[in-house]
Amino acid sequence: TYEILIGEARASEAIRKTEYRTDVIGSNTRLAGASLEMIDLPGREGRLRKALAEVQKDYDFIFIDCPPSLDLLTLNGLSACDSVLIPVQCEYYALEGLSELISTLKTIRKKYNPYLDIEGVVFTMFSLRYNLTVQVVEQVQKYFGSKVYKTTIPRSIRISEAPSYGQPINFYEPKGKGSEAYMDLA
């Protein structure tokens, strides 16, 4: 993605086929410095949108996985998409981050992407064994109402382990609760 954002490669050149029936434009450690390098580039907030326009017609959906920080990379992702699915960890600081994200989404709608919509909100690290989960769910449902998905992603060590084995959860533990939850979400 780094090469695409700074103009060294086209999206069509960066696409990789996977064994999971999805195409991926991967990331690497060079992406970490992209925000700084893009500061002086013209149209820096719309570079991903422009790059993806070339391949958009070839796909029904393009998913952009943004980092949790609200930096230039996230700004590019949100400027390039039609809607956002907000994962909310059932933890206290997630509410603070959510408040910042909502403010950022309003700014992006105003300045860069008037079509940006909130597709929905999905709870992650969900466990009713914790009072905090119930509190977070109540607060988020109060604000987002019907945008909150019924599907929740459970707190699970298997979900945490899967990436370290280079596998999505539905391959790492296909019959597990985490895998089933992600399949329900899809």
Where are these regions (language model features)?
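P-loop NTP-binding core
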Residues: 1-186
